[in-house]
């Protein structure tokens, strides 16, 4: 802002509020500083600043941290609310605020059982980043964004539909016996298709990330395609990614790149339809 001689743009405030929700709470501040500088300069300013960037800045920061410091983002140093240790502590009569443990996606990926029930997953009494755990609060936020027209309901709905379709396909593969329990993919592929929406960050990504008005598709039909592919790819990456059992941020960044292409073909398709109608009327 000082270099360009104008006020600080409000778009950075949104990024500043979202980033703490998608990173571990004990990540060193110097790492976060480096990542934010990268996200702002490479993810936004290089393209011309607010309104011109093609990648979601918060996800650019998240991606930089994941690839530059993977052990802090998905390794033993990740601080989460635990599972087995929590139950043991409760059984011993201890009171815990939080401990280090494995996320639900990590447990499923390893073929382990999960001690949380569906209501724990819905209310947010589960391991995970701050923003992704409580599905109830995410839904409240989604209703607010839709009511104020700040977020597209088409993108939210289509993202969830895409995730459900991919989950159904994987369930069908397991039910058909094409994948056995010995497969390393069996754990996540056998998860009920609807449960994918209440574990991990698919719901958070659909509401707060995919709906970014700058980097998402602008046409109505394009929003349906854009959102569906995000959900579809998110579950696919979640199952097949051997290093990190979550694919939402990668899927959104990928579709950010293809959003202009989707809109281009949607617009061209509409132009061709109108030209045909015009020829029919003038014939």
List the model feature ranges, each with a label:
Residues 239-283:
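Cytosolic-side transmembrane-helix boundaries in multi-pass membrane proteins
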Residues 51-139:
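Long hydrophobic alpha-helical segments that form multi-pass transmembrane helix bundles
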Residues 54, 58, 194-200, 223, ...:
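Loop-to-transmembrane alpha-helix initiation sites
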Residues 1-5, 40-51, 140-149, 207-216:
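C-terminal ends of transmembrane helices
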Residues 26-35, 121, 125-135, 188-202:
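Structural signature of hydrophobic alpha-helical transmembrane segments
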Residues 167-220:
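A beta-strand-loop signature enriched in Asp, Gly, Thr, and Trp
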Residues 14-25, 59-72, 162-171, 201, ...:
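Small-residue-rich segments of transmembrane alpha-helices in multi-pass membrane proteins
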Residues 12-16, 20, 32-35, 39, ...:
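Alpha-helical transmembrane segments in multi-pass membrane proteins
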């Amino acid at each position: 802002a000082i270099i360009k001689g104008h006020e600080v743009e409000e778009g950075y405030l949104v990024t500043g509020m979202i980033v703490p929700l998608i990173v571990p709470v004990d990540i060193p501040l110097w790492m976060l500083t480096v990542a934010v500088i990268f996200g702002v300069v490479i993810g936004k300013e290089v393209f011309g600043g607010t309104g011109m960037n093609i990648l979601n800045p918060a996800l650019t920061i998240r991606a930089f941290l994941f690839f530059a410091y993977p052990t802090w983002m998905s390794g033993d140093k990740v601080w989460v609310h635990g599972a087995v240790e929590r139950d043991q502590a409760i059984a011993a009569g201890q009171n815990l605020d939080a401990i280090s443990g494995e996320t639900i996606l990590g447990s499923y990926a390893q073929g382990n059982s999960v001690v949380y029930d569906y209501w724990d997953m819905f209310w947010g009494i589960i391991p995970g980043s701050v923003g992704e755990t409580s599905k109830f609060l995410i839904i409240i936020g989604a209703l607010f964004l839709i009511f104020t027209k700040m977020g597209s309901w088409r993108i939210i709905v289509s993202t969830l539909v895409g995730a459900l379709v991919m989950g159904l396909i994987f369930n069908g593969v397991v039910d058909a016996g094409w994948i056995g329990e010995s497969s390393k993919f069996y754990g996540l592929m056998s998860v009920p298709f609807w449960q994918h929406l209440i574990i991990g960050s698919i719901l958070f990504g659909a509401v707060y990330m995919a709906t970014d008005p700058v980097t998402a598709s602008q046409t109505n039909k394009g929003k349906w395609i854009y959102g569906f592919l995000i959900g579809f790819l998110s579950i696919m990456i979640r199952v097949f990614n051997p290093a990190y059992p979550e694919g939402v941020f990668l899927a959104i960044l990928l579709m950010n790149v293809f959003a202009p292409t989707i809109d281009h073909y949607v617009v061209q398709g509409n132009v061709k339809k109108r030209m045909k109608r015009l020829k029919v009327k003038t014939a």
